[in-house]
């Protein structure tokens, strides 16, 4: 299992929807019935042996993403990509091959290597190595450059665009009274659950706006490729994310461009995998060069490279859209920081805007599978929608506590670690999505805001996945 992503290891399923009770590919092992049981032991090399029957070595099971087509458990994607294509081993292989091609001047096969860093992994690595957040981003640039990266970017511009698209989508739906409650779509674990468990019921309510990762894929494979005059297929785009499900999101066929013969994101590695790479290199992050992140989008660099979006920890969707809708629909300018009211637990919160004693906006944040289940049941029971918008994330505490974030190393409780990361996030500068750069991208590359082109590349669609089970097996996880 060392060759595979840790997404298949049961110890790392914190960020996944609770696994389905039925596996679509239980491996059948033919064996004679025995009156006595057998013990299985794990050898030093990781192999399994049936120890009381002559030390019989057991065969390793290989599972691809396609095998897990209809599973809503640890692997949740319908794409036909082996999981080894989303591993640090595959990344190192590509980087080594590219380095050899450069050395031999085989320019036809040299690829431009682009890394994109999400905010949450930067925070996780900054805390792990006890360095400042901006310095952590700069050290990561130095590290990835040492591996052969040509560009190292942040998701800041994609985060901004995602909020601009999502807020406009909400206002349009609200004014047309269509498909409300609107549900956020940036969490791939939640989207996969919606597709495979509640299909036709939930999907009309899910926002069509792409996640920042996939918007970044468009920016890199189309806009940056045009700037460099390089075909998209000659760019290898790697993202660093806080959650394993982002690997599966990148593997969706919806995010493969037939015109460019290329995926928007070729490989996803996670915070914990970066930590493993640094451990294997036997050199802490702080010992790599301090290099500013690249900013190929305009001539003017922002003052900072790592930004927060509102107070909430998963992109700021609920807070930002609530403020925008209040101002543009009800002429209420909410300049103060919003306070969400905690309901049954800290991962289910809501906020209400009233005018003349009437509730005109009601938003919620639902993190974690328990709250997602409660939300879905609530939506099913109500004939008239109770919420206008819900920010939904599969992980308790949201993306800051993604299952691929670095775990505590000194006996520290995960909640304490999450609180420390929250403090780092709250101290980041706040980004205002409607800025000169996003306007420049819309006007110069996307034919303007709300154009047909911008909708085509910044929005996606979802699929009602129907499971046809040939074998049923109950599993207790």
UniProtKB/Swiss-Prot annotation:
Please list the residues that bind [4Fe-4S] cluster 1: 23, 68, 71, 74
Q: Name one GO biological process term.
A: iron-sulfur cluster assembly
The record, for SUPFAM superfamilies, names: Fe-only hydrogenase
Keywords from the UniProt entry: 4Fe-4S, Iron, Iron-sulfur, Metal-binding
Single GO MF annotation: metal ion binding
For this record, an example GO cellular component is: cytosolic [4Fe-4S] assembly targeting complex
**What positions does the entry give for [4Fe-4S] cluster 2 binding?**
187, 243, 395, 399
Family per similarity comment:
Belongs to the NARF family.
Q: What does this protein do?
A: Component of the cytosolic iron-sulfur (Fe/S) protein assembly machinery. Required for maturation of extramitochondrial Fe/S proteins.
- What is this protein identified as? Probable cytosolic Fe-S cluster assembly factor CG17683
State the organism named in the record: Drosophila melanogaster (Fruit fly)
């Amino acid at each position: 299992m060392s060759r595979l992503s840790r997404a298949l290891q049961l110890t790392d399923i914190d960020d996944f929807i609770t696994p389905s009770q039925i596996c679509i590919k239980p491996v059948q092992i033919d064996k004679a019935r025995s009156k006595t049981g057998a013990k299985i032991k794990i050898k030093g090399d990781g192999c399994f042996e049936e120890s009381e029957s002559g030390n019989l070595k057991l065969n390793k099971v290989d599972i691809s993403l396609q095998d897990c087509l209809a599973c809503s458990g640890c692997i949740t994607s319908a794409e036909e990509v082996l999981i080894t294509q989303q591993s640090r081993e595959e990344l190192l292989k590509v980087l080594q091959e590219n380095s050899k091609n450069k050395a031999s001047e085989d320019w036809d096969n040299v690829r431009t290597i682009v890394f994109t860093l999400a905010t949450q992994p930067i925070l996780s690595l900054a805390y792990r190595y006890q360095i400042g957040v901006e310095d952590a981003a700069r050290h990561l640039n130095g590290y990835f450059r040492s591996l052969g990266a040509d560009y190292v970017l942040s998701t800041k511009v994609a985060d901004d665009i995602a909020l601009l698209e999502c807020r406009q989508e909400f206002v349009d739906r609200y004014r047309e009274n269509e498909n409300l409650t609107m549900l956020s779509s940036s969490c791939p674990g939640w989207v996969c659950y919606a597709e495979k468990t509640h299909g036709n019921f939930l999907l009309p309510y899910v926002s069509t706006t792409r996640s920042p990762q996939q918007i970044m894929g468009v920016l890199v494979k189309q806009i940056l490729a045009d700037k460099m005059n390089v075909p998209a297929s000659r760019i290898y785009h790697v993202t660093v994310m806080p959650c394993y499900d982002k690997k599966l999101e990148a593997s969706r066929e919806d995010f493969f461009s037939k015109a460019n013969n290329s995926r928007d994101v070729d490989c996803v590695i996670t915070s914990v995998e970066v930590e493993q790479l640094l451990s294997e290199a036997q050199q802490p992050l702080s010992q790599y060069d301090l290099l500013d992140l690249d900013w190929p989008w305009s001539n003017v660099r922002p003052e900072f490279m790592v930004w927060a979006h509102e107070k909430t920890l998963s992109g700021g969707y609920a807070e930002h859209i609530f403020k925008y809708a209040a101002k543009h629909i009800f002429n209420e300018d909410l300049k103060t920081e919003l306070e969400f009211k905690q309901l049954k637990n800290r991962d289910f919160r809501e906020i209400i805007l009233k005018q003349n004693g009437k509730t005109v906006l009601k938003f919620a944040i639902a993190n974690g599978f328990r709250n997602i289940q409660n939300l879905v049941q609530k939506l099913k029971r109500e004939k008239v929608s109770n919420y206008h918008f819900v920010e939904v994330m599969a992980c308790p505490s949201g993306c800051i506590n993604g299952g691929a974030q670095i775990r505590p190393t000194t006996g520290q409780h995960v909640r304490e670690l999450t609180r420390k990361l929250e403090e780092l996030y709250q101290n980041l500068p706040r980004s205002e999505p409607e800025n000169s750069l996003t306007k420049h991208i819309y006007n110069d590359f996307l034919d303007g805001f709300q154009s047909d082109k911008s909708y085509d590349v910044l929005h996606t669609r979802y699929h009602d996945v129907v499971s046809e089970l040939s074998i049923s097996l109950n599993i207790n996880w």
